[in-house]
Amino acid sequence: MPRYLCDYCQVWLTHDSQSVRKAHNAGRAHIQNVQDYYTKVAQEEAQKQLEERASSGFLKKGNGSLDLPYAYAFPPKYNVFNLGCPPPPYIVSANTYMAPKGMNAMNAAAFVPMMPAVNLTNQVAFSAPQTTASSNTQLTQQQQSLPQTNEHQRARTHSNANNHFTKTHHQGQRSHQRFVRA
């Protein structure tokens, strides 16, 4: 029977069958060897690419810094027409409170900006609805009719609740008594 060599583990398996290879490939040592192999291959590939770039002149020979084009030396220009993007961080927004431009540093330190006054007369505050005399009489008529229906409903639900309680209570006692006797 032919034997099988695992390239990652450098181990000869007892015989070349699908079940033996499957069991070996599921093993912890084999999985670790496969991971080590591919990380080593990736590191070698990255080192090779760095050496190719260095030899092609992408890196400067003198100090080893990147030779980038001059376009990256300055920040990009702000596009005024593109209003969907937020402004760059170095632009101060218009609603920031600052000292007036004519003040010197000493006066600017003592300058405390005042918050704008808010006019509350146009705003409507939440208030409870006001009732009138006619609506008061309607409310009293409704309130007089409500307790009668509520009492009937309350008595009916109370009796139903008592019936339910007594049924379940007796059933529970019976089942408990059966359990104790048995």
From Swiss-Prot:
User: What is any one of the record's Gene Ontology cellular component terms?
Assistant: U1 snRNP
Q: Which family does it belong to?
A: Belongs to the U1 small nuclear ribonucleoprotein C family.
Protein name, per record: U1 small nuclear ribonucleoprotein C
Q: Per its UniProt record, what InterPro entries does this chain match?
A: Matrin/U1-C_Znf_C2H2 (IPR000690), Matrin/U1-like-C_Znf_C2H2 (IPR003604), U1-CZ_Znf_C2H2 (IPR013085), U1_snRNP-C (IPR017340), Znf_C2H2_sf (IPR036236)
Q: Which GO terms describe its molecular function?
A: mRNA binding; pre-mRNA 5'-splice site binding; U1 snRNA binding; zinc ion binding
What subcellular locations does the record give? Answer: Nucleus
Query: Matching PROSITE patterns, A to Z?
Result: ZF_MATRIN (PS50171)
Compositional bias (Basic residues): 166-182
* Biological processes annotated in GO: mRNA 5'-splice site recognition; spliceosomal snRNP assembly
Zinc fingers (Matrin-type), renumbered ranges: 4-36
**A Pfam family of this chain:** zf-U1
The keyword Ion transport is assigned to this record? no
Transmembrane residue ranges:
none
Residues covered by region (Disordered): 129-182
The free-text function statement in the UniProt record for this protein reads: Component of the spliceosomal U1 snRNP, which is essential for recognition of the pre-mRNA 5' splice-site and the subsequent assembly of the spliceosome. usp103/U1-C is directly involved in initial 5' splice-site recognition for both constitutive and regulated alternative splicing. The interaction with the 5' splice-site seems to precede base-pairing between the pre-mRNA and the U1 snRNA. Stimulates commitment or early (E) complex formation by stabilizing the base pairing of the 5' end of the U1 snRNA and the 5' splice-site region.
| Species for this entry | Schizosaccharomyces pombe (strain 972 / ATCC 24843) (Fission yeast)
User: Its quaternary structure?
Assistant: U1 snRNP is composed of the 7 core Sm proteins smb1, smd1, smd2, smd3, sme1, smf1 and smg1 (Sm proteins B, D1, D2, D3, E, F and G, respectively) that assemble in a heptameric protein ring on the Sm site of the small nuclear RNA to form the core snRNP, and at least 9 U1 snRNP-specific proteins usp101/U1-70K, usp102/U1-A, usp103/U1-C, usp106/LUC7, usp105/PRP39, usp104/PRP40, usp107/U1-H, usp108/U1-J and usp109/U1-L. usp103/U1-C interacts with U1 snRNA and the 5' splice-site region of the pre-mRNA.
Where does the source fall among the domains of life?
Eukaryota
Family annotation (PANTHER family): U1 SMALL NUCLEAR RIBONUCLEOPROTEIN C (PTHR31148:SF1)
UniProt biased composition (Low complexity): 130-150
Keywords assigned by UniProt, alphabetized: Metal-binding, Nucleus, Ribonucleoprotein, RNA-binding, Zinc, Zinc-finger
